[in-house]
Amino acid sequence: MLCVLCECRKAMLKRPKTLQPICKPCFYNVFETEIHNTIVESNLFFPGERVAIGASGGKDSTVLAHVMKTLNERYNYGVDFVLLSIDEGIHGYRDDSLETVKRNKVQYDMDLEVVSYSELYGWSMDQIVAQIGNKNNCTYCGVFRRQALDRGSAKLGIAHIVTGHNADDMAETVLMNLLRGDTARLDRCTELVTGSDDSPVKRSKPLKYAYEKEIVLYAHYKKLDYFSTECTYSPEAFRGTARTLIKNLEAIRPSTIIDIIHSGEAFVLKKKKEKKGKGSVVVKAKVEEKPVPSGGCSVPLAFDSSLGLSNRCTKCGYLSHNAVCKACVLLEGLNAGRAKMQIEGDSADGAAKNIKTLEKLALSI
């Protein structure tokens, strides 16, 4: 059977997204072109921007790094990409995957920065799970990871991170929020670019519309070097329930993944229109043009350094709406469980060393 796109080469695979029989060169082309179109249509980058790639060593981040390097050279984005990895401290998983990232650093000729939970917080994920058990450990990891990425970006002087979240991840998040009745989060979870007042860093997802199966095929046919083991603690996550449901639906209807994403986007748009009110006129505020700082998705950062310390955590100096940021709140709970452990001579309490470490790394905004 011939490829339906070029009609000259033998079809080597059936594309998961469309079920079209295509050859490998055409598959590479459509896969990369769709990602390029996502980047261009959303104005994700600007020439001279320095952008961090969230690198875990897994298939998604490895394909992301490979494609970003390829497209950057092909279309002359003029972007300086660097790799940023987080070491959560999960033995047998993260230590091995970081070795893959180190090889990717050489393969793609990119700088690499690794930020460790143990250095930032005084806790590894293995220690956290040993303390709290298997439930809710993803909550701790999510909060700590987000702040670790911000601090790593600040160290690199970067305000824009691209992550390997794919279409399957997006659909799972939409479904999770619906199953939990958390429709308020649909707005954020369907956006290609996200940011918040609690973070100085913009995050974008160039692989938003790329199917996981196609990412795996791309990595396989391109013979990319990636780590394929799943996180030790992820089977306990609620996301697994949504993933199983979506995989079952996808087997019947391949377009299910994109359909769910578009449904989430449409739901958000409808909510926004209803909030505006019938007959109301929405006037966009005029934004004063200023030089865009390093990184930022071509959009000035949403925070203002003139806000001062009132918007910073009183313990570690991290941006926060509350007096104490989420990471420090979680750390206080963890350190309370260490009451019977020997207190280090130079620390007033079990949390002091961790807080001092975070204070030294307070973001300069």
Swiss-Prot record:
Pathway annotation: tRNA modification; 5-methoxycarbonylmethyl-2-thiouridine-tRNA biosynthesis
Alphabetized UniProt keyword annotations: Cytoplasm, RNA-binding, Transferase, tRNA processing, tRNA-binding
GO cellular component: cytosol; cytosolic tRNA wobble base thiouridylase complex
The keyword Transport appears for this protein: no
Pfam families according to UniProt: ATP_bind_3, zn-ribbon_14
InterPro entries: CTU1-like_ATP-bd, CTU1_C, Ncs6/Tuc1/Ctu1, Rossmann-like_a/b/a_fold, TilS/TtcA_N, tRNA_thiolation_TtcA_Ctu1, UPF0021_CS
Stretches that traverse the bilayer: none
EC number: 2.7.7.-
SUPFAM superfamilies with a match to the protein in the record: Adenine nucleotide alpha hydrolases-like (SSF52402)
Keyword DNA-binding: no
An example Gene Ontology molecular-function term: nucleotidyltransferase activity
GO biological process: one example: tRNA wobble position uridine thiolation
EC category name: transferase
Subcellular location: Cytoplasm
Job description of the protein: Plays a central role in 2-thiolation of mcm(5)S(2)U at tRNA wobble positions of tRNA(Lys), tRNA(Glu) and tRNA(Gln). Directly binds tRNAs and probably acts by catalyzing adenylation of tRNAs, an intermediate required for 2-thiolation. It is unclear whether it acts as a sulfurtransferase that transfers sulfur from thiocarboxylated URM1 onto the uridine of tRNAs at wobble position. Prior mcm(5) tRNA modification by the elongator complex is required for 2-thiolation. May also be involved in protein urmylation.
Family, similarity comment: Belongs to the TtcA family. CTU1/NCS6/ATPBD3 subfamily.
HAMAP family given in the database record: CTU1
Protein name: Cytoplasmic tRNA 2-thiolation protein 1
Organism: Yarrowia lipolytica (strain CLIB 122 / E 150)
